[in-house]
Structure formats: structure tokens, C-alpha cells
């Protein structure tokens, strides 16, 4: 018979699973993710398949060359949303360091981020993600091609209602459960939506953007996750990338993240191991240093060449001019 504490833990996991439409999986308490939910819908997967075919064909001229080489500059807004007791948590220096890390992480893709502004707000409800829709309706700036990042000081798991709604929308997020209560969400972000076009009303993309726990910014108090890596990971989703362990299977039928040069991976990485091979019968070790894994910040280092190319192609296909 399980000890009482173990029974409580098992019941908690069962309860969480009953509220998730998508896969929920338990990991170590100090890992980047307790419950990975949601995922790309059929239309988004089809776009990845189309771009995979596009990228594998020979270049057809000057347009392809420009698409491959032209620098991409993304207008960006940072919104610092704090509770009253955390009003001074995010300093100007942390904002500067986060932006610097963002520029460095994406420079090999020739993608840069032009910070249009930083807004600061003290709102207990928004700081804990109590009303995501109202917050974004009030704070969001720019069109669909504008990146909005919401750094919230007490970002919490969504309510059961919001949880079901978000997963049905196909958003990507990951939750973090420390040994401190209550559990916090490190971040979540929207994938590009193939249905959005230049004439789409603002209401159709009002939730677009990335929510990031402010404590993960450079210099924040989240040990092993305070170098700014969460924002890099989430913005990778905004740029169209999936997790390196997408599908969580070694099966040949699993398309994974639709990126040819990321090795097959069946489980997220926890922390920063010396190496890991979750699919030993497939070529290559798990890319534990990839920004789209769940490794700790001290392990994060890079995107692959094909990930860099895919983000550029996603920009031209899904966000530019919208």
C-alpha cells in the first residue's frame, strides 16, 4: 500500500489529467514542465509539412534568395505586469539583459527585435494570470506581426475553464511546479495561426503573444531558470517552432517537430544532463542544448540550422504584413 503522501500525490495527478484534453505527464518537481498540454492543430501541421517540402527543393531564383537572406526586424513590446508586493521585482537592467539575450539567441537567423516600448502595470489579477483576455485586450500593441511579451510576476496555471479553452485553441505552454506552493507557470505562447490574414480583425488575434514568468528574466530569483531562457523558448513558439520532443514518441510514424536536423526525441530534458538519448534506435543524441527542449537555462545554447530557416519561412508565410 502506498504511503498517505504518495496517495495524495497520485490523486493530484489523476485530477490534473481529468482536466486536460491533451497529454499531461508528471516529471521531477524541479523540472521545467509538470504538465505539457495543447499542441498544433491540423492546419498548422499542414503548414509545417508545406514548408518542409518547400525548404527541401532547389532554390528557384532571386525571391528565394531574398527570403533566405533578408534581415527580419520584428516590432516588439514588453509588458511588465506586477503584483503590489512585487512591484520592484523587474528592474530596468533585467529588461535590458533580456532583450540582449533575445537578440543574441536569434541573430544566426538574421532575426532582430526592435523594442518599441516597455509598459509597467501593477494589477494583482493580471500578475497571476487571473484574466488573460482582459489584460491582453488592454495592453496589446501593434498588428499580428508585432510581438507582445507579458512578463508576469506571479504567473499561475489557468483555471479549469481557461485551461480547456486554451488547449482547444492549440496554444503551447509548460507549467513549472517547484517545492514552493502554489505552482507557477514558466510560460506559454501562441503559435502562428494560418487563418489570420492582413484583413483579419484585431479581435481574431487579441490573445496572440507570449506570457512569461517574470522571475525567469536574467537576474530573477528562479534558480536554474533565471537567465532569460524561458522567453527565448516561448518566442520560438511564436515564430512557429514546436518542441524537439513533439509527439513524445520514437515511432517512425511520429513527425515530431517537422525539422529535419533535430534528432528524434521522446521525452523532455530535465535539468542539464551530460547527454541523453531517449530514442536510441534513431540517429543522434537528444539535442539537450536546444532552446525548444525543456532543459534548464544553463543548458540552453542554440537552435539548429533548419530551425533557423523554418522560423524565417514561418515569418514570411504567417506573420509578415499582417
Swiss-Prot record:
Q: Which CDD domains match?
A: ZnMc_pappalysin_like (cd04275)
Tell me which domain of life the UniProt entry assigns to the organism this sequence originates from: Eukaryota
Disulfide partners? 272-299
Binding of Zn(2+): at which residues? 233, 237
**What biological processes does GO assign it?**
proteolysis
Residues with an annotated glycan are: 123, 197
Enzyme Commission number(s) from the entry:
3.4.24.-
For this protein, the record's InterPro entries field holds: MetalloPept_cat_dom_sf, Peptidase_M43
Q: Residues in the active site?
A: 234
GO molecular function terms listed in the Swiss-Prot or TrEMBL record: metal ion binding; metallopeptidase activity
Compartment(s) of residence: Secreted
Q: Which residues form the signal peptide?
A: 1-22
Q: Which family does it belong to?
A: Belongs to the peptidase M43B family.
Its biological function?
Answer: Secreted metalloproteinase that allows assimilation of proteinaceous substrates. Plays a pivotal role as a pathogenicity determinant during infections and contributes to the ability of the pathogen to persist within the mammalian host.
Name of the molecule in the record: Extracellular metalloprotease AFUB_008060
Q: Which organism is it from?
A: Aspergillus fumigatus (strain CBS 144.89 / FGSC A1163 / CEA10) (Neosartorya fumigata)
Amino acid at each position: 500500500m502506498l504511503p498517505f503522501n504518495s496517495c495524495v500525490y497520485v490523486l493530484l495527478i489523476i485530477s490534473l489529467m481529468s482536466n486536460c484534453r491533451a497529454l499531461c505527464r508528471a516529471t521531477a518537481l524541479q523540472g521545467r514542465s509538470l504538465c505539457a498540454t495543447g499542441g498544433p492543430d491540423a492546419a498548422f501541421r499542414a503548414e509545417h509539412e508545406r514548408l518542409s517540402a518547400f525548404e527541401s527543393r532547389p532554390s528557384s531564383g532571386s525571391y528565394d534568395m531574398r527570403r533566405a537572406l533578408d534581415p527580419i526586424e520584428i516590432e516588439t513590446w514588453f509588458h511588465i505586469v506586477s503584483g503590489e508586493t512585487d512591484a520592484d521585482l523587474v528592474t530596468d537592467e533585467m529588461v535590458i539583459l533580456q532583450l540582449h539575450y533575445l537578440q543574441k539567441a536569434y541573430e544566426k537567423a538574421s532575426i532582430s527585435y526592435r523594442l518599441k516600448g516597455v509598459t509597467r502595470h501593477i494589477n494583482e489579477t493580471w500578475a497571476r494570470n487571473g484574466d488573460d483576455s482582459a489584460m491582453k485586450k488592454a495592453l496589446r500593441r501593434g498588428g499580428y506581426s508585432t510581438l507582445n511579451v507579458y512578463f508576469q510576476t506571479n504567473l499561475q496555471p489557468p483555471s479549469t475553464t481557461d485551461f480547456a479553452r486554451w488547449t482547444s485553441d492549440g496554444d503551447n505552454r509548460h507549467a513549472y511546479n517547484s517545492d514552493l506552493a502554489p505552482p507557477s507557470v514558466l510560460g506559454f505562447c501562441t503559435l502562428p495561426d494560418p487563418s489570420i490574414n492582413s484583413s483579419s480583425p484585431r479581435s481574431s488575434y487579441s490573445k496572440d503573444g507570449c506570457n512569461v514568468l517574470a522571475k525567469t528574466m536574467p537576474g530573477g530569483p528562479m534558480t536554474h531558470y533565471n537567465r532569460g531562457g524561458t522567453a527565448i523558448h516561448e518566442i520560438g513558439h511564436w515564430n512557429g517552432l514546436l518542441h524537439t520532443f513533439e509527439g513524445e514518441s520514437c515511432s517512425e510514424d511520429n513527425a515530431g517537430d517537422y525539422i529535419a536536423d533535430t534528432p528524434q526525441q521522446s521525452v523532455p530534458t530535465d535539468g542539464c544532463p551530460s547527454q541523453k538519448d531517449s530514442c536510441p534506435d534513431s540517429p543522434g543524441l537528444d539535442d539537450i542544448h536546444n532552446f525548444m527542449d525543456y532543459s534548464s537555462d544553463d543548458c540552453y545554447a542554440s537552435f539548429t540550422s533548419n530551425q533557423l530557416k523554418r522560423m524565417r519561412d514561418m515569418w514570411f508565410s504567417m506573420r509578415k504584413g499582417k
